[in-house]
Design a protein with these regions (language model features):
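Conserved beta-loop-beta/alpha segment of the NTase-like Rossmann-fold superfamily
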Residues: 1-67
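Left-handed beta-helix
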Residues: 45-287
Length: 287
């Protein structure tokens, strides 16, 4: 899920009828790459008490989320609507990415009443009238030299504009932990996260270090795993982690402060037990 065709799939598969017949009233849908999204009795209770047909979870923005989609209110209809950055006019980009003007972003965790969704899908013959988003891609996402193509898609969260009684709810950052790039994967695999005995993320203030891996060597998962053969470095003491060039990491590497590795122009190695800081591989005297 994540794209708008999830609603058509639910309709055509007959799953909505099956769920209703089993006594289900609500659906929770999230992006499959959001590792923080999970059923919540607290959030579901808030949705049930709201009486709304549709609810979107939003979270506070950080600088890293400036380009994320946001829930705004339509001047024409007064309804909530999803605005992705690809849909923002160039003249409005600065305001749209200002976290003081738009402090929340769309997590794409949604809650919807099955009965209301069925009525809407029936009205539109199984295909909701969602705005089309244009994205530039390559035929092979792992090879930027392949043919350029235009991908047309719709966003699941855009359905918020079709429900007049739709609402938003602010949730903690722990409910939005997406893995879309290998930069995200570094954080999720690091010691900045801890699982409970129920294999859920521990509650906490999830302020992440800024990660920038050289896309020439780390963009694809095969290349990423080859260069982190043991595990990713410790990021517990890191504000940021930047890797320029082709570096392979040994065991028990620790990053601190604004850790930075420069491109040496050749394949390079971070030895076991090393400390990486602003000056590259450093001694452990910082402790």
């Amino acid at each position: 899920p994540g794209h708008g065709d999830v609603f058509t799939s639910l309709w055509e598969s007959g799953l909505l009828d099956v769920l209703q017949n089993e006594g289900m009233e609500y659906l929770f849908i999230s992006n499959s790459d959001n590792l923080g999204a999970r059923p919540s009795s607290t959030v579901s209770g808030a949705f049930a008490q709201s009486g709304a047909s549709f609810m979107v979870e939003v979270a506070r923005k950080t600088d890293a989320d400036r380009k994320g989609g946001q829930i705004v209110r339509s001047r024409q209809t007064g309804c909530l609507m999803l605005r992705e950055m690809t849909q923002v006019h160039p003249d409005d980009k600065e305001a749209a990415t200002d976290v003081n003007i738009h402090p929340f972003f769309n997590t794409n965790n949604i809650w919807v009443r099955i009965s209301a969704l069925k009525r809407l899908l029936k009205e539109h013959k199984g295909i909701l009238p969602l705005p089309v988003i244009r994205n530039l891609k390559t035929v092979d996402p792992t090879d930027p030299s392949t043919q350029n193509v235009i991908q047309l898609e719709t966003a699941m969260g855009a359905a918020v504009s079709l429900f007049e009684d739709a609402v938003c709810v602010e949730v903690s950052r722990s409910r939005f932990l997406p893995v879309k790039t290998t930069n995200d994967l570094v954080i999720l695999r690091s010691d900045r996260f801890h699982l409970t005995d129920a294999f859920e993320m521990e509650d906490g203030n999830y302020i992440f270090p800024d990660i920038n891996l050289d896309t020439r060597y780390y963009k694809n998962i095969e290349d990423f795993d080859e260069r982190f053969p043991y595990s990713v470095p410790s990021l517990a003491a890191a504000n940021s982690f930047t890797v320029e060039g082709d570096w392979t990491f040994g065991k028990d590497v620790h990053c601190f402060a604004d850790a930075h590795l420069s491109d040496l122009g050749r394949p390079s190695y971070v030895p076991n037990g090393s400390f990486v800081g602003p000056q590259g591989i450093e001694s452990d005297s910082w402790q």
